[in-house]
Amino acid sequence: IYSALFSWLSIKRQGGEWLLRIEDLDIQRCRREYADQLEDDLRWLGLIWDEGGSMGGDRGPYYQSERSDIYREHFVRLQEKGLIYPCFCSRADLRVASAPHASDGIAPYMATCRNLTDVERAAKAKERNPSYRFAMPDGEMMFSDGNYGRCKYDMQKECGDFVVCRADGNYAYQLAVVVDDALMGVTEVVRGCDLLS
């Protein structure tokens, strides 16, 4: 609610439109009744959105679970440009690889599968379905944050190559949210500060 309030206030002050997108990619934990309750809570607080959610609008669908074809199209584009690659690491493999860094809370993926040969990939594909990771380029990324000002991060070092499509074929939040923001014309994103750490 905190993020919703601040984004609503910011958008209304600027004369913009407040969009409600339901980020329900995790079908195990996200049920439609939760989204309905969120809408009821926002209405009760007087935070009325201009489009999205059950209200609909021109840039929908607004439920990410209904946008798989859109994500597939952009996934294929990334694949054609060589910006993603298959990863055959299991969760157990990743836990072992990050064990020395467990006290850090999050250890970036060490790009174990990034430079596999086609022969190695074909052999691993016989054993398990891969997830797909974005090949994060080296170098610093800079952006302006409304609260923290100019921010600079070495994304390869701090995040590593992140999953864009899980081994079960479901698209990851990291791909979906970027595609949706671009296609829906989102110009301001209000998130918790945990995403900056």
Predicted regions and their residues:
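Active-site cores that bind ATP or allylic diphosphates and position pyrophosphate for catalysis
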Residues: 86, 91-197
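N-terminal Rossmann-like or analogous alpha/beta NTP/dinucleotide-binding catalytic cores
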Residues: 1-102, 193-197
